[in-house]
């Protein structure tokens, strides 16, 4: 609590000094810390997504990284109910 002396106008704090950091954490400081954490997380996500997804290394040929593979390809080939003329020509 802040005490103001009525005769001199000087202000003094009557609170005991606190070593707890959470007591000094204002909403402004909290939002600043939160914004910094979000920006760092977005930078990490951006760097990982722009590295072609090959962060594990290994002996993967370079042209296999950029190619598109249809995830439904095996499912569509194994579908017994799909009898199109193009399928019968295979």
Curated annotation (Swiss-Prot):
Its main location: virion. It comes from the Viruses. It is found in: Virion membrane. The keyword Transmembrane helix applies. Keywords: Membrane, Transmembrane, Transmembrane helix, Viral envelope protein, Virion. Disulfide bonds: none annotated. The chain crosses the membrane at residues 27-47. InterPro entries: Baculo_ODV-E18. GO terms for cellular component: membrane; viral envelope; virion membrane. Pfam families: ODV-E18 (PF10717). Component of the polyhedra envelope. Plays an essential role in the budded virus production. Initially termed ODV-18 since it was found only in occluded viruses. New approaches also found the protein in budded virus. It has therefore been renamed to E18. This is Protein E18. The gene is E18.
